[in-house]
Every structure is written in structure tokens, then in C-alpha cells.
């Protein structure tokens, strides 16, 4: 996370935790997989499973081959492989998934600063902030830096992209990717990845028009007439059917596809054994969906207070 633009503060947070652990003489052992049963056999009275998450891999043709490097001219990477620099992106990148991770990855691709913070002058220029006292509101025309790559973001839902982002900071992420000229496509069905790029289908009708129709039907009126319950259900099913059937194919000639399609918990064997009241699962290992660092930290603090 600390390599994502705007999140460099994680570096200092991690250093603080490491220093605290060293000061408390905590023994940290790495490079070996263990199970709760093995730790119980060694005499540990309480066991905390905080093993985090792994990227969820979608299932459609070309994903597995791409991850294994078997597609000529196209790199397929998980978000973890990308941000850790295990795999290097090209010049034209498709980001599959538009949740919080998808937006972080898009910003990383547009503004890859190799983990160094953005300078104040660069930030001021990007957002149009000026120090001249004679400028109204100290704001002028934003002058964002030239994006380092061409990025297209895709999501399956037909809803407006970025709706699930945080209420206080979501607008910043949406504005940042917009400044980078990111193309955004919603209502996508992923068909395959091959040497030509990413193959998808999209609705023929603008998803925003479809959503407007659905909203009207659910309100009980449509095209000037009042609907009863049966008519509403029939129209909603018709709209859904037409959306699935009336689609067009599209090939996006990207050289890189990044998978930001959710996460799944990592749990060692036996972590959920029945009757093991001294085995505690927290953080991403507990619930991977919409993983929230604040929630994970709260779970850890509350558990530590109990034991």
C-alpha cells in the first residue's frame, strides 16, 4: 500500500510498529508456514491468525495463461504483483475492477513515483493551488502532470464507477484518475485475454439510460403510466433480458491487464477447528470482502485487550 500515490505515510506507520515490537523484545519468526495445531503443541496458550488476504483470480479464458506468462505481447498481473514490482506494466493498461484497489492501482499506473512522495509544488500545480494573495480563493486552473501510461478501467456493474469509494476521499480518487485521462467502461462482461488484448462485451444501450429506466420502473411510473406490482416486475425482467441480449463485442488492445477483482482470506489449515477457543481469526483472514485497515486494527486492539 505504501507504494500507492498518497499512501506513503504507511511507511512510517510500519516503522513505528516494528520499532515498538523490537523494544518489547517480541520474537518474530518468518519464512516458515505453521498451523494452529502445531503452535498449540508447542505450548502457546493463545493463537492469533492474522494471515491477511490474497488476490481473488477471476475465471475466464486467458487469465491463467496470462498469469503464467504464456500470452505473447500481453502481461497479466494481480494487483499485488504489480505494486510489489514483481511484474512490470506496459504503456496501455486495462484495470479489471473499480473498487478501492482498482482506483489505487489506476493512480499508481498514472503517477508511478517509485514510492517517493509527491512534491508540494507538483501537488499545487495538479490541483490549481496558488500562493498569490491576489488570486480569488488561491485557486487557478489545475495543471496535472502528463500521465505515465494510458489506462482503461472496467467494471461489471452498470452503475457509475467509484460509487463504493469512501465518502470523504472518494471524490479525490475519482478526480485524480479523471485528470489522468482514464477511460472508464461499465456493464462489462469479460470474454477472454489473448495476444490481441482484452476481449469484452458491453451493452448496446448506454448503461446510464438503462439505470434511469430501472429507477423509473421501481418508482411505479414508466412512460407516463402508473404500474402495478406485476407490471413493474415484468418490465424489470424485460430490461434485464434486453441488457443481457443486446450487447456488442469490443477488443481493447492493451499490453497489460491488472486484476483488481477482490480478495480472499488466507487461513492456515485448522484455523477454524471447532472448540478451539484460544484460536482467534482477525483482519483479512476473518473477512476479506471490502477489507478495511481500520476494522482490522480495531479487531486486533480489542482482541489484545481481551487476552
Please tell me what each predicted stretch does.
Residues 186, 202, 283:
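Pocket-edge structural micro-motifs
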Residues 196-201:
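Short polybasic amphipathic segments
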Residues 29-40, 50-66, 72-165, 205-307:
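Rossmann-like dinucleotide/flavin-binding elements
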Residues 5, 71-72, 77, 185:
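Residue-level signal for pocket-adjacent positions within structured domains
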Residues 1-44, 162-188, 226:
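N-terminal Rossmann-like dinucleotide/flavin-binding domain of flavoprotein oxidoreductases
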Residues 189-193:
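Short, exposed beta-strand/loop patches in secreted or surface proteins that constitute
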